[in-house]
């Protein structure tokens, strides 16, 4: 039997490899493996908890330099007195807020996820962009279309 969803996933994985977006490509290949094996019974859990688990792993990666001591406390304290660091803090707050809006939008309008993913891959492939991820893109979309 012909599986259109599998074909779409393979196409997106190919776009990921072509655009040197290995994060997208590997993620899609893992989902393909889950889809074509008995692991497919885990899809309800992945759909419900996957984003939360991913954000936890991302947060661990971001906080690791603080926890390991690579980023000393003096550097953290200094970030509150340097104007460039204050701008970075403000931008970080704004981007985090956008990501929150993005999660809401993706949960309420899941049909936009494919468009966000394709747009991210095309941006990397055609404009030498960086795959910053669909959460921020979804947050920006939510500013235009609303987050309902």
Swiss-Prot record:
It comes from the Bacteria. GO terms for cellular component: plasma membrane. Keywords: Cell membrane, Membrane, Transmembrane, Transmembrane helix. The keyword Heme does not apply. The chain crosses the membrane at residues 14-34, 51-71, 86-106, 121-141. The keyword Disulfide bond does not apply. InterPro entries: UPF0756_TM. It is a multi-pass membrane protein. It is found in: Cell membrane. Belongs to the UPF0756 family. This is UPF0756 membrane protein YeaL. It comes from Salmonella paratyphi B (strain ATCC BAA-1250 / SPB7). The gene is yeaL.
């Amino acid at each position: 039997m012909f599986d259109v969803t599998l074909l779409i996933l393979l196409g997106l994985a190919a776009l990921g490899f072509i655009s040197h977006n290995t994060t997208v490509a590997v993620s899609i290949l893992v989902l393909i493996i889950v889809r074509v094996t008995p692991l497919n019974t885990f899809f309800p859990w992945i759909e419900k908890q996957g984003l939360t688990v991913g954000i936890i792993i991302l947060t661990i990666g971001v906080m690791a330099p603080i926890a390991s001591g690579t980023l000393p406390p003096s550097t953290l304290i200094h970030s509150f007195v340097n104007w460039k660091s204050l701008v970075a803090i403000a931008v970080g707050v704004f981007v985090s807020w956008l990501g929150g809006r993005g999660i809401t939008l993706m949960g309420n309008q899941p049909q936009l996820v494919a468009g966000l993913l394709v747009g991210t891959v095309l941006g990397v492939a055609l404009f030498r962009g960086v795959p910053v991820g669909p959460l921020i893109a979804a947050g920006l979309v939510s500013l235009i279309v609303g987050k309902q």
